[in-house]
């Protein structure tokens, strides 16, 4: 079986490949292909991938590294999509430009997320068309390109029959943190319920061996005033710089996890996705953001630098620090999902899917994030009761903003894109929305379609 990773130059690629290789018997994979339009970057990452496959794990999996679409997708069974259109240079614009107007500057939320979405819609549609043309007829695309909410809505609208499952690892990262906070060794034994949109949802239940963990979690968060356990805080240097309130010192993620405490002080019933901070505490997040040093800069100075410094060191000395080659835990998540699809396991995963009545008081065609059982025919979504009015109201505002953005992008409609920016909860007024949009149009020349 062939698995292709589209966006092979990503810092996450080595970790994903390792997860695939560790499941090589389950997946029956004999070839992994890396595909990217940035040859220089991908060639460097491929050095690490080759080491993982043929030295660390000593597999006989064939590695193909290409910039050619036909070579990348021919006879592929799975395509993992992790594109970042515009790279970190454009991510930096997405984050810093809204901050100049007093609005949240974030990769996937608010105006920055909408800018990123506008750049990604048509490249994702091209990827689907290329895969349809060259891959096996029963292919699956597993897409975790951000912003997943906007991308999944565009796929639903423009390529409704595509065999694509849109996923996000942030809820899984939250469960990782919950497991650490609760002292649970095997996070796979945690069972949870969740509803929302992508980067816009809530855990309604978290159980371990039948025990409801929510009361313990609420108490833990209230006592510590943050969800992160001490080991995580030490890892980001937060415990050594407690007097500073600058994001550059502690890292922007510290405030996102601290925001879990602040949200639950007011709305304690559900555990929120960390991204809800940008909507429910937009003013506060702008106030302690550094407009000259955002998350894009942090990533370039840490994950990016560590990976490519590690590659250079390996090429010069032959010495390997494997810790520099792995970033995040979503490789396991994606590989497990692939195994469920291939082997019809009916394992439970959280996915982004068309609602189709699963949440009765949300639109039928809304792209929602819900648990589903995954088998060879795709997801079987787990339906639930009506959601509370507060969450429904927030979700409808966000959903309609995303739908208008996709419509505006596809139609080339300036008015609809402006409506999307205006409707977004991170933007205080129509005039601010217009000022940001006009600046975004200038910054995204060559990436966005023309708007009239």
Q: What annotation goes with each model-predicted range?
A:
Residues 183-452:
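Long, compositionally biased stretches enriched for glycine and/or charged residues
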Residues 1-3:
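Extreme N-terminal starter segment of soluble prokaryotic enzymes
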Residues 89-158:
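Rossmann-fold NAD(P)-binding glycine/threonine-rich loop
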